[in-house]
C-alpha cells in the first residue's frame, strides 16, 4: 500500500490526444462516470451526436514520496533543433520545466515498455523461490469456491 503522507497521482490515456505527462490527482471512478454523463448530456449538438470528449481508457498510478530522493544520476541526449523546439513547446504547454517534462515522459514510457514484457530473467535464487511458490499446496478458500460456483454475467443462456 501507499506510505503515509504519499500523494497518489494518475496519468490518463485519452482517445483525443495521447498521454497527459504532468501528474494529476486521481478522480474516483464514480465521480468520473457522473462527470462523463453530465458532459454527454450537455454536449449533444443539433446533429444529436456527442462532441468528442476525452475518456480515460487506462490509468498509470505513481506514488510520490513527500520528501524527494537525492538525484545523483545524469542523462543527456543530442537533438535536432526541430526536436528540441517540439519538446520545449510541449513542456511549456504542460506548464512544467523541460527537465521535469522529459523525465516524466521517459519514466512513463519506460514503465509501459517493462509492463508489456513477456520474458523475465531471474537469478538462481529468485528462480528457486518462484518454483517453491508454484509447488506449495493449494489452500482451501471457501469464498473463492463460492465465487466460481456462482453463475457469471458472461455465461450464455442455453
Swiss-Prot record:
Gene3D superfamilies per record: Single helix bin
Result of knocking out the encoding gene: The tacA-tacT operon is non-essential and can be deleted without an effect on growth in cell culture.
Keyword Transcription regulation appears in the UniProt entry: yes
Pfam families reported for this sequence: TacA1
GO molecular function terms noted in the UniProt entry: DNA binding
Function of the molecule: Antitoxin component of a type II toxin-antitoxin (TA) system. Counteracts the toxic effect of cognate toxin TacT.
Subunit structure: Forms a complex with cognate toxin TacT.
Name of this protein: Antitoxin TacA
Organism lineage: Bacteria, Bacillati, Actinomycetota, Actinomycetes, Mycobacteriales
